[in-house]
Regions:
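Face-selective signature of the C-terminal outer-membrane beta-barrel domain
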Residues: 312-332, 354-517, 523-535, 539-543, ...
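Short acidic/polar hinge/loop motifs at secondary-structure boundaries
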Residues: 65-67, 190-216
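Short strand-turn segments of transmembrane beta-barrel domains in outer membranes
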Residues: 210-212, 219-220, 235-264, 295-304
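A beta-strand signature from Gram-negative outer-membrane beta-barrel systems
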Residues: 102-104, 205-242, 787-788
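Membrane-embedded beta-barrel scaffold of Gram-negative outer-membrane proteins
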Residues: 541, 549-553, 580-636, 657, ...
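Short, acidic, small-residue-rich periplasmic hinge/interaction motif at the N-terminus
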Residues: 34, 46-48, 79-83, 95-143
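Gram-negative outer-membrane beta-barrel transporters
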Residues: 491, 602, 607-611, 628-720
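Periplasmic-side early beta-strands and strand-to-turn transitions of outer-membrane beta-barrels
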Residues: 240, 248, 265-348
Length: 789
């Protein structure tokens, strides 16, 4: 080999060496810090590079990211209060491309002094201490349940879920006297619509890690609109390879199944995840008709079917601190049950069906050495909705069959075989900037788009009009700016925010379809409003055991697609709807007694006042229905809750809520005196609560086993589903009492078995509009978990 070639090769090796050193100098260490026992993320854990002043802290999801300078130590120290510190060597096995992936599990300190156990504050308790009025349902409360999310929420303080039957039937969430469309639903912070649009029963409880219920004020970072509050569902995020399968069988041919899979690619933080759900319920129970004494009605056309799956990829090692892309598809089919509001209409053939597909993208990135954090969530969904009502015959509950009054169809004036196409886009952008150690500025923008393309050729041929309506579009933007200030070492927190609400819709009103024969023009509705809020929290006593909080808010709820577009069957378009407005006040306190040892007791109290106007209500005519702005409502009330951990194996809990919602319109619709002025709002429970006890013990049957027994008793005072104009009101929903018991056993932390009896007293209970509920039901659930796949 010539000297020239030797020199050339030497220079090449030298250049490559310097290049490698430069790449290594720019390495970034990243990862997630979690509790080694619960795998919950640790917010605020410190990561320090040995023999340097370089360090960082983990964010709210436990993620950290830190640059490693050249020739620095390759050892980091991870610390968190109440946990054992860890020293970690960053070796080549952790390298991923030009970065180092280092996920850290910290073990809690085992501070045991005789029978005194140091407990400290859980993540859920820290969430409760925020300025907003909030109820937290954590993973420990969900652990022993076989119930659906609707039933879980129904037992929370200040919350009531009004259902119209078994699994798959319509339900609405009531928070502080506001219900349904006024309650926002979020999943991992992403707005999914309101509680009327989104079916909580479609989410298996085994996929849920925590439920946050915001009462009155919706936090700025959620970014949605609403009057009564919001429900944010945090799904489980597994930090290791994980496969989980669950199946439940219950009375009345009810079956619920779910599967969750997450598989990490090698030793990277990139993972593939998938999930599947299956729900089926025949709902074939009987009830005593409230309209005809002695008549027993059997629900024989109320079956519900739901199947869904999702696949996706997530990563923490790419340019983004957090990346997740998910594709999902769902199928729903629901039979329509007759005889609920009368005894004549025994529907036997009509049903609804929905097929949908969506894609969701979540991104998170920190800038400026962690001072600025950007989060972006996007969901694009498509759905095809069918309402099928084509029978030539109608039926009654005596067994008679007779021809349909319109020739075909059991429900409306004309038959239906609709093929309505819906397109939805929901996007959320959060920017959070940290100023020093005690200030945060958050800017949030939420965009929502909805488009309906109705089609029902069968109905149009009978009515000779486009019965299902015309194409309609909806755009809305909610943008808000919030400033958070913490003083006196975090003992005082103040949040001040402002929001702008913009609404734009294009709807072809149904009235023009009747009156005009030429080309129709869309009715355009534009509206821009502003809202504001202020919330504060003051922590007192050692360990911040007492938290006082108060909040005030002027907020807006914009009309949704269903209210504007109609349904093409009985519900007409309402193109001139105005947004609802509300002024809300909340004040409360949380007292944590013996925060660091047994017996531990938490007492919470919250009072509220709300004054809402331009309330959107459903108005009835002889043939159809339509929404209109006619309402003015005042709500006031109080909710209290108590939770106690008496010792290692015994927990107690209870709550009670009183709310008073009144009609405050002095003038009736169309003029004249409103005879319902100051009457209680119909179909709104005003006094309800529940108590529960839970016994749990580890190692009872074997060293790695866990056993539990739980019992809850819930009550709802009788209330009217019409205006209480007379002391002898016949439209009354009787008081509801329900006693449930459950046992749970976990074998070697993999196989779990649960058995629950609901309504053990076998009472005949009724829900809103006196819809009948199930009597005693039995539920058997099995779950199997594999952490090595």
């Amino acid at each position: 080999m010539s000297d020239k070639n030797i020199l050339h090769n030497f220079l090449l090796v030298l250049i490559l060496s310097f290049t490698w050193q430069n790449i290594f100098a720019q390495k970034i260490v990243f990862g997630q810090i979690t509790d080694g026992q619960t795998l919950q993320p640790l917010d605020g854990a410190s990561v320090i590079l040995e023999n340097s002043n370089i360090g960082t802290i983990s964010n709210h999801i436990g993620m950290f990211r830190m640059k490693l300078p050249s020739k620095s130590s390759r050892r980091i120290k991870v610390q968190y209060m109440g946990y054992k510190s860890r020293n970690i060597i960053l070796n080549k096995k952790l390298c991923v491309n030009d970065s180092i992936c280092c996920n850290v599990e910290l073990q809690p300190k085992n501070n045991i002094l005789s029978d005194v156990i140091v407990l400290g504050k859980s993540k859920a308790q820290r969430h409760r201490e925020v300025p907003s009025a909030i109820t937290i349902i954590d993973s420990q409360e969900l652990k022993y349940k076989t119930a659906t999310l609707n039933e879980i929420l129904d037992n929370a303080a200040g919350i009531k879920v009004a259902q119209q039957g078994g699994l798959g039937n319509a339900s609405r969430i009531i928070i502080q006297g506001m219900d349904g469309k006024r309650i926002g639903i979020f999943i991992n912070g992403m707005p999914m619509g309101n509680s009327d649009e989104f079916q909580l029963s479609s989410i298996p409880i085994d996929m849920v890690d925590e439920v946050e219920i915001y009462k009155g004020i919706i936090p700025a970072w959620l970014g949605g609109d609403g009057l009564g509050g919001a429900v944010n569902i945090r799904l489980k995020d597994f930090k290791k390879n994980h496969l989980e399968m669950a199946f439940e069988a219950a009375s009345y041919n009810t079956y619920i199944g779910s599967l969750q899979l997450k598989h990490y690619l090698g030793k990277t933080s990139t993972a593939l995840h998938a999930g599947a759900t299956m729900n089926y319920a025949k709902n074939n129970y009987s009830f005593s008709s409230p309209f005809e004494l002695g008549r027993i009605i059997h629900r024989d056309h109320d079956a519900y079917t739901h199947g869904g799956f999702n696949v996706g990829i997530s990563s923490q090692q790419w340019w983004f601190d957090q990346f997740d892309l998910t594709l999902s598809a769902d199928y729903y089919r629901k039979e329509i049950q007759g005889g609920l509001m009368n005894v004549q209409n025994n529907i036997q053939h009509a049903f609804t069906r929905t097929r949908s597909a969506s894609t969701s993208l979540s991104l998170e990135k920190s800038f400026l050495k962690g001072k600025l954090t950007a989060q972006f969530h996007s969901i694009v969904g498509f759905s095809l909705v069918n309402q099928v009502d084509t029978s030539h015959y109608c039926y009654d509950f005596i067994g008679n069959r007779f021809p349909s009054g319109s020739g075909r169809g059991e429900i409306g004036a004309v038959p239906n075989d609709s093929h309505d196409r819906h397109t939805t886009v929901r996007e959320l952008l959060n920017l959070t900037y940290k100023i020093g150690n005690n200030q945060l500025v958050t800017w949030t923008t939420n965009y929502r788009y909805g488009c309906k393309m109705p089609k029902d050729e069968l109905a149009d041929s009978y009515s000779r009009l486009p019965t299902s309506g015309y194409p309609s579009r909806l755009h809305s933007i909610v943008s808000g700016l919030t400033h958070e200030l913490k003083l006196y070492g975090g003992k005082f927190t103040n949040e001040l925010g402002i929001k702008l609400f913009n609404h734009h819709s294009e709807v072809l009103p149904f009235a023009e379809a009747i009156m005009l024969q030429d080309k129709l023009k869309a009715s355009t509705n534009r509206c821009t409003m502003a809202g504001w809020s202020e919330a504060m929290a003051l922590h007192l006593l050692p360990n911040n055991a007492l938290t006082l909080k108060a909040s005030v808010q002027s907020t807006v709820r914009m009309p949704i697609a269903e209210e504007l577009f109609g349904d093409g069957v009985l519900l007409l378009p309402s193109e001139k709807l105005r947004p609802e407005r509300s002024f809300n006040i909340n004040a409360g306190a949380i007292w944590l007694i013996n925060a660091m040892r047994y017996p531990q007791v938490r007492i919470g109290i919250n009072t509220f006042y709300m004054s809402a106007k331009d309330m959107i209500k459903l108005m009835y005519s002889s043939m159809n229905m339509a929404y209109d702005n006619i309402g003015k409502v005042r709500v006031m009330g109080i909710d209290m809750e108590m939770e106690s951990k008496l010792n290692r194996w015994l927990d107690l809990q209870g709550n009670i809520t009183w709310q008073d919602a009144r009609d405050m319109r002095k003038e009736a619709v169309g003029g004249g005196e409103n005879f319902h002025y100051r009457y209680r709002i119909p179909n709104m429970p005003y006094l309800f609560g529940n108590v529960g006890v839970r016994l749990h013990k580890d190692g009872l049957l074997s060293k790695s086993s866990s056993s539990a027994f739980a019992s809850t008793f819930a009550f709802t005072k009788a209330f009217s589903y019409n205006w209480e104009a007379s002391k002898h009101n016949t439209m009354l929903i009787p008081a509801r009492y329900c006693w449930d018991v459950a046992v749970h056993h976990s074998f070697n932390k993999r196989f779990q078995l649960s058995f629950e009896i609901r309504n053990i007293l076998n009472r005949e209970n009724w829900a809103e509009f006196r819809y009948p509920m199930e009597r005693r039901t039995f539920h058997l659930k099995m779950k199997y978990i594999i952490n090595k796949i």
